[in-house]
Amino acid sequence: MNIFRSIIVFIVLLSAVSCDAPKLNPLDPANPDSRLGQFYGYVKTALLPQQPIVGVKVSWKNDNRLIETDAAGYYNLENLPIADGTLYFDKDGYSKDSIRVNWQNNKSIDLGTILLNAIPKLNNLIIYTCVENRYQDDQKDTLNVKANITDAENDIESVSVRCTALSFNKQLTFNPKSNLYELNYFYGTKNSVSPLDDAIGKNFEIIVKDHLGRIFNIGFSTIKRVIRQEISFESPANGVTVGSNPVLRWIRFLPGFNFQYMIQIYTREANPQSVWTSQYIFKDDIEVIPDKKLSVGDYYWVIWVIDDFQNRAQSKQASFTVQ
């Protein structure tokens, strides 16, 4: 009986001591003995007014931790071993960023707001070749680039086109009329040491540099074809005299790929002026009549062949006179 009473007293005393002891959670950063910590913050757009960015991947590689920001752009990483490291931020459509975390004896750190810069967006890209047939059996080759690019921050400093395989890197010029970044580059002639044909199938990348010096590779395209076959005119030619509505005829073009014609008439003078253009002429056609009367004077006309990728070739010039 005495032994039983002694056991009861011991249990009661032990319970009393346990109730008076402080309850310290080893995972609680407030616990002075804890070696775990937390940090938190927000991710927003650099563009004003700053807006929260949801779904940003926030990674802490020290502990192989990865979370995403919520609808408010908020993140909170808890129960982390306290060791200095780098926190990374990654979101499609935005430039990557990072921040160095130094605990400095802190166990809970407010990292404030990280601002992500939107990556310039390539909406459309056309890269095509142009071959102009000239007399003396010569051909002039031109590489053309047209890029539609938008940037939320409007901080683009330069845009260039690059082909590493060809050691080619040229800057594009913004055309306010077309709202495009463009390049019209004389590549050489048919007999160039490095002909335009070498560019077929190579990747041409669009590179954007912003005002902070950040570089973005925003997309690429390839050259599909260089049209070397020559389209030949039939009449009028060689300065023949015609009326004000001449019938323009050419020899049927059979290149083995889909295409359309474009016809242009220019004044024949030191500074030629375009007086008439007809586009989207069906590939089976071999003649066209201008839908406007030409004034008395000297002219020449050319035939363009344009494939489905905008690659094109121009005939030699055919001259005529209107009387």
Regions found by a protein language model. Give the residues of each.
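A short, solvent-exposed loop/turn motif at the edges and junctions
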Residues: 88-104
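Extracellular acidic, Ser/Thr/Pro-rich low-complexity tracts
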Residues: 145-155, 210, 252-257, 307
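Short, ordered, surface-exposed loop/turn motifs in non-cytosolic proteins
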Residues: 39, 47-62, 155-159
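Short Pro-Gly-centered beta-turn/loop motif in secreted/extracellular proteins
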Residues: 76-84, 92-93
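Bacterial Sec-dependent N-terminal signal peptides
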Residues: 14-42, 47, 95, 108
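Short, acidic Ser/Thr/Gly-rich low-complexity loop/linker segments typical of extracellular
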Residues: 54, 63-74
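Glycine-centered loop-to-beta-strand initiation motif
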Residues: 41, 69-77, 114, 179-181
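Extracellular beta-sheet/turn segments enriched in Thr/Pro/Gly and aliphatic residues
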Residues: 23-30, 103-125, 232-234
